Amino acid sequence: MAATAACASLLLAACVPGLSDDAGLYFGRNDGSVPMAERQTVEVYISDTAPRYAGIIEDVAREAGGVLGTDGDSRYGGCTTQDEADVDIAWAALDVALIDYDDLRRIVWEGAQRNGFAYSATPDYSGKNNRRSVAVGDEDGNLVVFTHLEGSGFINISFHSGCMLPTHTYDLDTPYKQLPLPSVEEMFPNLRIVDAFDENSNLNPELSSQSGAQSGTQSGS
């Protein structure tokens, strides 16, 4: 997309061509404009598309110190179409240390431009945590939302696919859940993977903005 924001409304220090704050540019989950039969299959999504979104997430995580927190598991789900063949993927919730919102916007925008994805931002504060967000998506309904929680001190990352078919020759006798999902460690081998929260729901100290910048990038948990 080639929407251009008015420089006077930008929070960035300099006007970035193509940067838009139009929340209407979001691609909602399962709301892709491409007909189901023409969308990528799960196999193509996992091998090609998901890694490109993961690259943008990694860029943000590196800026935040190279530590990526996880909360929950990645899973397959049924789509809102209620067609038994349609599936989507909700990846594990991810969190990184807080970075400057303008830096977050710029990194995500650059990743969107590099990959041909759509970009959107909501720069106005909302809620008690001073929430702001940045999102990147595509016409297949795939979506990654970075929620900048200034009041909580971290960035939450929601990573979802759009609706799709396991294969273009889907066989109901071959359950889609037999298609393995890569682990967070496999998707982000260059980042240090940690539990985002402890058993008391306290944020991992490695994800605090103070420690994140000093952690460096390491593989493994």
Feature names for model-found ranges:
Residues 68-72, 117-126:
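Surface-exposed patches in mature extracellular/periplasmic domains of secreted proteins
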Residues 11-14:
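C-terminal motif of bacterial Sec signal peptides marking the signal peptidase cleavage site
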Residues 26-45, 75-110:
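Terminal, regulation- and interaction-focused segments at domain boundaries
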Residues 8, 72-73, 156:
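Residue-level signal for mature regions of secreted extracellular proteins and peptides
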Residues 58-79:
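Short, solvent-exposed beta-alpha or beta-beta edge segments that form flexible loop/patches at the rim
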Residues 16-56, 122-221:
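An acidic-aromatic pocket/loop used at catalytic or ligand-binding sites
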Residues 1-7:
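N-terminal export and membrane-targeting signals
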Residues 52-63, 99-121:
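Amphipathic alpha-helical segments
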